Design a protein with these regions (language model features):
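Beta-propeller blade termini and top-face loops
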Residues: 1-286, 293-294
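Short edge beta-strand/loop segments characteristic of extracellular beta-sandwich folds
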Residues: 297-301
Length: 311
C-alpha cells in the first residue's frame, strides 16, 4: 500500500508517466522504468534490472507523497524517477534514459554499462523527451522542462556524438513557451517540430530559428507529438489530438522563394463498402460522414497589393 508513504520507503520509485517501450530490435522485448530500467524478453512474464539508479537519488526530495515537488498523497507521484526511455532505431542495445531530476544516461551494450551524458551546466530539470535522429545514429535531441521550479524557459538540446557534447537549440522560442518535446522529421533532415506550453514551433534549419506553427489551433499546451505516415500528430494537455494531414508541403518549404510550385501527395482512389452505410433502417445513419472531395484539390496563395482608397 503506497498511500501516504514516503518515496524513500518504496523499493521502486515510478513516475506518474512511467515510461514503457517495446524494442525495435528484439522480439517480445519491452523496457519499463522506475529509478532503474527494467527489461523483459517474454512480454512481461518476468523482468530483470538492467541499470543502476539513474537519478540523483536525493533523500531530502523523497518525502511523503513524493514531496517536495510532486506532492500527491496516494503514492502515484514520486520524484527522482526515470521520465523517458528511448531505444536507438539504428543500433540494437543503444538506449537513452532521462530522469525527472535532470540526468541523461546512455548504454551502448544493452545495459551492461552506463555513461552519464547530462549536458554540462544543465540545472535540475525534467528530461521530458529524447529523440534519436532518424538520419544519423549519433545525433540525439532532448527537451527539458523546469516549470516545477517556476522556470518557464524553453530548453532544447542537440548532440551529434552520442551525448558527449550538447548545443542549446532553443533559439528564439520565447520565454513562457517552455518545452516538452522535440522531434526531427523522418524525411527531411534538420526539420524540427517542438511542442511547448503555448503550442507548436517549427524549425527548418535544425533549431537555428523557430516559428510558431499553431495554424488553426488555439493556444494549447502540447504534451507530445510524432510524425507518422507523413502526418504530424499532436497530443495536448487538454487530452485532445490534432493532426496535420500530410507533411509533404512543409517538407518542400524553403523559406526563401516568392514563388513555389509544390508537388502534391499521391492520390489514392478508394472503392469499398461498409456495414455502416445504410438507409437508416437499422439506425446507423448517425455514423455517416462527409467524404473529402474527389480528385486533386489545388490551393494557391497570391500576394496582392491592396488599394489605398475605398474603391
Amino acid at each position: 500500500n503506497y498511500i501516504g508513504r514516503a518515496s524513500r520507503d518504496m523499493k521502486y520509485r515510478f513516475n506518474w508517466n512511467a515510461p514503457i517501450i517495446w524494442s525495435q530490435h528484439e522480439p517480445n522485448t519491452f523496457y519499463h522504468a522506475a529509478q532503474h530500467l527494467f527489461k523483459t524478453n517474454d512480454q512481461g512474464k518476468s523482468w530483470k534490472i538492467v541499470s543502476p539508479d539513474l537519478t540523483r537519488d536525493e533523500d531530502e526530495k523523497q518525502g511523503n507523497g513524493g514531496g517536495p515537488y510532486t506532492n500527491e498523497a496516494v503514492g502515484a507521484e514520486n520524484y527522482g524517477t526515470i521520465s523517458y526511455v528511448v531505444e536507438s532505431p539504428h543500433e540494437a542495445n543503444t538506449i537513452y534514459v532521462g530522469s525527472d531530476d535532470g540526468l541523461v544516461h546512455i548504454t551502448q551494450d544493452g545495459g551492461e554499462s552506463w555513461i552519464d551524458i547530462t549536458p554540462k551546466g544543465l540545472p535540475e530539470t525534467i528530461i521530458n523527451a529524447i529523440d534519436v535522429s532518424p538520419h544519423d545514429k549519433a545525433t540525439v535531441y532532448i527537451a527539458t522542462t523546469r516549470y516545477k521550479f517556476n522556470d518557464k524557459t524553453p530548453g532544447l538540446y542537440k548532440s551529434t556524438n552520442y551525448g558527449k557534447t550538447w548545443k542549446n537549440i532553443s533559439g528564439n522560442i520565447p520565454n513562457g513557451a517552455y518545452t516538452r518535446v522535440v522531434r526531427e522529421d523522418n524525411k527531411r533532415k534538420g526539420l524540427l517540430v517542438a511542442g511547448t506550453e503555448l503550442g507548436v514551433y517549427i524549425s527548418f534549419n535544425d533549431g537555428k530559428k523557430w516559428e510558431l506553427f499553431n495554424l488553426n489551433m488555439p493556444v494549447l499546451a502540447i504534451t507530445d507529438l510524432m510524425i507518422k505516415h507523413d502526418d504530424l500528430i499532436i497530443a495536448t494537455q487538454g487530452r485532445s489530438f490534432w493532426i496535420l494531414d500530410d507533411m509533404g508541403l512543409v517538407r518542400q518549404f524553403d523559406g526563401n522563394s516568392n514563388t513555389k510550385l509544390y508537388d502534391p501527395e499521391n492520390s489514392t482512389i478508394g472503392n469499398w463498402s461498409s456495414e455502416l452505410n445504410s438507409n437508416n433502417s437499422d439506425g446507423t445513419s448517425s455514423f455517416t460522414g462527409v467524404n473529402p472531395a474527389n480528385g486533386v484539390v489545388t490551393v494557391s496563395y497570391t500576394h496582392l497589393t491592396l488599394p489605398t482608397n475605398d474603391q
